[in-house]
Amino acid sequence: MPALPAVPLDAAAQALPATLDIEASGFGRDSYPIEIGWVLPDGRTGCLLVKPAAHWTHWDEGAAALHGIRRETLLAHGRPVAEVAARLNDELGGHTVYSDAWGHDYPWLAVLFEEAGSAPRFRLEPATRLLRDTQLGQLDTLHRQAFDELAVERHRASNDARALQRALRLLRDV
């Protein structure tokens, strides 16, 4: 597959990118989104727990140990799939949204919107698409730095989205 063209971040007036992160029931074909967090270019954030659809039964205790979300919590406090899809479209519609785990997040969004019977009105792209070749090796380091500076817990969707947006901002100065 050909490499995607890099879009430089060096314009000082350029808005911060919208970012998104998804926590899931595990990995693999039967996994599904359980928490979706995002940060808009103006800094507004959102986060929703997703109530699993009745046929979404896959649950990986290893993944649960990382994100700390129990299935019982989702069943009691999660929002219905259609409501989550509608809210994502309301909040993110018209934006290109960036993910540092696009290879996982894209299929999980597809699962969510397919179950909701709707389509996203935003575009999800890999965060690396924003970077020049010389910046690619620095993203992980600056992502860790962003978590430290923000003093937030990892593997919660809105925190991860905030840290990614901050890391991308830090890369502007590199």
Locations of regions flagged by a protein language model:
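Secondary-structure boundary motif
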Residues: 90, 94, 115-118, 173
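Short, motif-level signal for alpha-helix interfacial/capping segments enriched in acidic residues
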Residues: 1-7, 135-140
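Short, glycine/charged-enriched secondary-structure capping and boundary segments
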Residues: 32-35, 111-115
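Acidic, Mg2+-coordinating catalytic module of metal-dependent nucleases/exonucleases
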Residues: 96-102, 107-112, 142-174
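A short alpha->loop->secondary-structure connector
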Residues: 113-125
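Conserved non-catalytic scaffold segment of RNase H-like nuclease domains
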Residues: 2-104, 147-151
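Active-site-proximal helix-loop-helix substrate-binding element of RNase H-like nuclease domains
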Residues: 55-58, 64-67, 71, 125-165
